[in-house]
Structures are given as structure tokens and as C-alpha cells.
Amino acid sequence: MTQKDAAFHIERLLKFALKKGLIEELDVIPSRNALMDLFKIEKPYEGEVPEEELDTPSPILNKLLDYGVEIGLIEDTVTYRDLMDARIMGLLMPRESEVVRKFNEIASKDGIEKATEYFYELSKASNYIRMDRTSQNLYWRTPTEYGALEITINLSKPEKDPKEIEKAKKIPQSGYPKCLLCIENVGFAGNLNHPARQNLRIIPVKVAGEQWYFQYSPYVYYNEHCILLHEEHIPMKISEKTFVRLFDFIDQFPHYFMGSNADLPIVGGSILVHEHFQGGRHTFPMEEAPIEEYFIHPKYKEVKAGILKWPMSVIRLSSKDREKLTKLSSHILNVWKGYSDESVDVLAYSEKDGKIVPHNTITPIARFNKEGEYEIDLVLRNNRTTDKYPYGIFHPHEELHHIKKENIGLIEVMGLAVLPGRLKFELEEIRKILTGKEKFNKDMYDENHPLYKHLHWIEELIVKYGTHCTEEEAENYIKQEVGNKFLQVLLDAGVFKRDEKGKKAFEKFMETAGFKKLS
């Protein structure tokens, strides 16, 4: 690629940035100069630049990255290309203060919904949300007795090259930023161990009298998947304050739900070291789940309460009275934290090395329901392990690890499976077996083979469906069976099982918390 070609792609990118509102007319010349400096280009392209309708800058960025490789600016690996494309887009971004000013102006003039729309579009146009990757994720819905569960196979996090992994290990850790959620990520250039964030912008939001910040997730597992993060690097903690914060947020952003991962290992999310919530604009299967048993608490008669028909153990509370809802949520949390019932393997505490270890916590999700009431789902969690279940008693059991072994966090709890990218290839190979394109003999697979972990499952599928399916049949069967596995994952994670014994144990807990069952 010549310098002239690269200069042409810079003009395309400037047009894109102008069209998407990243820059204004007065910014074109300085932005051009900054990009020319980055790529060591001596003069701009002077020919005609055709009009384009692009949703993302990726097609243009890929050309400029190729040029960067050619001139020795970067190595040709996924990580170096990612570091460079964030750097390129960082040169086209409005400053943090400008974004916040515009967000607040739109919110006061046209309402918060329009403001989040602006910010979401900005996050996509800046390539912070890599829509070219997230659009590759596989997605389907699987009907079950609990409604249609949502399944995604996550292809948006590219695999790192083994050489890069080795190289990254040798880089000294600076400890700055402390984690991926710290506010110091805004504008950070990144390195082999930490993604570049020159194209990240965040919006300050006050909740519970504290300073928090609002941004979108770069991986958008669902529509307008957002993150609310504490200004300080403090660990996750579920307490009464959590409920105040969640309700404060939805008061300001009523079109979004907001939830928190649990604050204990195994049942929590992947980042426990930084207090944060996740929300967005998506109706999850759990939200549509009906209440199967109604309860009332004599001290909180203004609050409707019930147990959800859901594979995990969920108490739903709703009320117009936010204060009462907060107090009752806090009461349930405190009772649950100290609650044990050995008959169903629930122990609130254990002792390790002379220290008391807590096991019970909650995954809370707040929203406004269709009646305009505050609504909160409290998902009861327990992270105890035993010799029989070293990964967790209420965690996907080992026979499901071939599909999902990671923590069951907030997103999965609500009925959306985020499954590892390796499954795309593995499920395609299994489909070939069900259609007869590949012969199956379990002795063909040693433990290093990608299908080895699925052998027992493949045998079950062959018994059930045979090896003469059409392509379409095989695909549908596999999707249904993966959905069934995810349902089993959620059932494993539920503390009170869905059988008679589990239902009675759940009712006993509700009684302990002071609830009366409504017949």
C-alpha cells in the first residue's frame, strides 16, 4: 500500500467521524494532521472521496492497520492491531468534558433516553464497542418449561497468539490502572496486558450520594449493555446501600434495568475487586417469569412478594414505595446471610484456618415493571464447596463443564447463557457426526482432541437422534440440547431445588424471614 492509499483511507475515516458526530467541521484539519503524523504521511490525499454508508469504522481501520504493519509501526497480531486502532480512534474523539456536556444538554432538553441513545451511538462509532466482532456472536432461543432461554456463543473476544501471551508475561506490571473498571482507563494507551482505552468515555452519575460513572460494555452481550462503576477501586459488597444505589440509578435512567453480581467468589462475576453494576435495555427471560407463590410480610404490607417460577431461587418484590422496598430487600439479605438448612446443603458459614468464611449472598436486579412500580429480583446464592463438588455445590456440576464451567453471574442468572467461543467449532464437528458426514468412534479421540470432553454427550445424541439427520435437523437438535444443558446449569446453581423438598425448604426460609404465604 502506498502513502497515497493510506492518505485516502485517512480521508474516508475523517468523513466517517464527521458523519457520526465524533468531530465537527472545524476539527477536520487538526484531526487530519494528527493522523498523518501517526502514519508518517507527508501530504494529504487530494482526490475525490466517495460517500459511504458505514455502521462501524472497522473496514477503514483494517486498511490503516495493514499500512501500519507494512511500515513497521506495529506487529501484525490481534493485540497490536487492537492497541493501534484504539489509538487511531482516540485522535478523533471529543474530550471527556465535551461528551459529558453534550450528554447532559440532550438529557435536559430531550430526556435521558435520547441522551443514552447519543452515548451508545458514540460508543459504537468510536469502535469502543466493536460491533464488527459482537455481530459475529451466535445467538438463539431455546424453549423450556421456564420460558425461552437465550443462548450466545461469544466470539467477540479474539484468541491471543501464544507468542503474545509469552511476551505479555515478561512485561513488568505497573499496577496502573488497577483494573479494567477504574476511571483511569479513560484515554489509557494500553499494553500487551491491558487493552487500550483512548476511545472510552464515561458519564458521571450520582447514586446514594456517591460519585459513580456510566459507560457501555465493549462486549455488548445484549442491547445497550451498560456498566455503572464506583469512582474508587473498592471491592464488591452487597448491602442495604446496594439497593439504594440500584433504585437511585433506575430513578435517573427509568428505561434501563440495573443489577449487581454477587460479592463472593464462584457465585460472583469475574471482577470482584471493583464495585460495579451492569444494566441495559433488554427483556431477559427471568423478567418474564411468573410468580408461582405469593407472600406478604406483616411489616411491609405495601410490598408485593413472591417466589418466581425460575430454575434458580428468586424472590420478586414490587411496590410504589421505594423506601419500604429497600428496607425489605435489606431484611431478606440479612436473614439470608445468616441462614442455614443442612437438609438442602445450605450452610451460611464454615471455618477455614481458624477464620469464619461466609457463604450466603444475593444477586439483585432492579427495574420498573409494566405497572410502573419499582421491582427487584433477589436471587439467593451460596458458594460453598465440598470434596464431591470442588467447584461449588451450587455451580454447574462437572458433567456440564464441557458446555459451561465459568461462574454463573448476573447475565446467566437472568437467562442469557454466554458460552465460550470454542463451542462454535466443536458444535459444527458434532453436527457432522449427526448428519453422517463424519464417522464416530470414541476410540478415535484422545484427551487432547477438542471433542474429547463431549464424548459422553455425543453418544447420548447419537442414541437419541441417530446419524442420518439433515443439516437443518442436526443444527436444531444441537441448539435445543445446548439450551437444555444451560437449563441444567441454572438448576445446579439454584440453592432451593425445584422438587418438593426444595420448594418446602424455600417456603421455610420465607417463614424465617417473617413472610406469610397467601393461599
From Swiss-Prot:
One of its GO terms (molecular function) is UDP-glucose:hexose-1-phosphate uridylyltransferase activity. Transmembrane segments: none annotated. It catalyses: alpha-D-galactose 1-phosphate + UDP-alpha-D-glucose = alpha-D-glucose 1-phosphate + UDP-alpha-D-galactose. Pathway: Carbohydrate metabolism; galactose metabolism. One of its GO terms (cellular component) is cytoplasm. Pfam families: GalP_UDP_tr_C, GalP_UDP_transf. Coiled coil: none annotated. It is an enzyme of class 2 (transferase). This is Galactose-1-phosphate uridylyltransferase. It comes from Caldanaerobacter subterraneus subsp. tengcongensis (strain DSM 15242 / JCM 11007 / NBRC 100824 / MB4) (Thermoanaerobacter tengcongensis). The gene is galT.
